[in-house]
């Protein structure tokens, strides 16, 4: 059975997503911070999109850039910088691609009994910015986080293979 995800709009500008993963926090954290692992779960498979480029320098001041595309369509980009990186427990980054100003995402990874409670808190610069993002995002987010859970379980089942050394799938 899939782990339950909750999505809650906390205010006009805040969105909180929670999800439990069937893997320890260090594995889930690595999957969020290593480009070779991000490539394996970040894009919902049903979207028909491919991750064309994936850069993540997960350190304070480091930058990330994810570029998605499909065929002849114009690629979409998500990019920003890491504001806080506490290994295996917390990530904070900016989202600088929006037309409404900069959003900030905080993700916490709390390990409980070998599983990870992930809480993702997005703070948008305006109500309009969150309105633009929230429509239709829950299904894609659910699929993406299910893919992350599958990857984390696979990585956890191979304890001799550190997540950072995992071989990425062909893009």
Which residues are covered by each model-predicted region?
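Hydrophobic ligand-binding cavity/cleft-lining segments
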Residues: 1-48, 171
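Intrinsic-disorder/low-complexity, polar/charged segments enriched in Ser/Thr/Lys/Arg/Asp/Glu/Gln
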Residues: 12-18, 51, 63, 77, ...
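Beta-strand/loop substructures that line and gate deep hydrophobic ligand-binding cavities in soluble
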Residues: 14, 92-143
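Short beta-edge strand/loop motif at the mouth of beta-sheet-based domains
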Residues: 16-17, 36-75, 161-170
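Hydrophobic/aromatic beta-strand elements that line small-molecule binding cavities or substrate pockets
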Residues: 19, 53-56, 78-84, 95, ...
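A short, structured loop/turn motif at beta-sheet edges
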Residues: 25, 57-59, 83-89, 108-117
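Hydrophobic pocket/interface hotspot
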Residues: 28, 38, 64-66, 82, ...
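A conserved amphipathic terminal alpha-helix motif
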Residues: 123-171
């Amino acid at each position: 059975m899939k782990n339950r995800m909750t999505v809650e709009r906390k205010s006009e500008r805040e969105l909180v997503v929670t999800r439990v993963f069937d893997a320890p926090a260090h594995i889930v954290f690595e999957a969020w911070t290593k480009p070779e692992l991000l490539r394996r779960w970040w894009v919902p498979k049903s979207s028909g999109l491919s991750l064309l480029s994936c850069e993540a320098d997960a350190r304070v001041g480091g930058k990330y850039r994810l570029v998605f595309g499909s065929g002849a369509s114009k690629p979409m980009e998500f990019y920003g910088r890491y504001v806080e990186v506490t290994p295996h427990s917390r990530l904070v980054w900016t989202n600088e691609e929006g037309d409404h100003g900069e959003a900030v995402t905080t993700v916490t990874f709390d390990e409980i009994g070998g599983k990870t409670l992930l809480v993702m808190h997005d703070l948008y610069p305006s109500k309009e910015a969150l309105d633009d993002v929230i429509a239709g995002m829950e299904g894609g987010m659910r699929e993406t986080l299910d893919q992350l859970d599958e990857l984390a379980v696979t990585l956890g089942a191979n304890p001799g293979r550190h997540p950072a050394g995992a071989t990425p799938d062909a893009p």
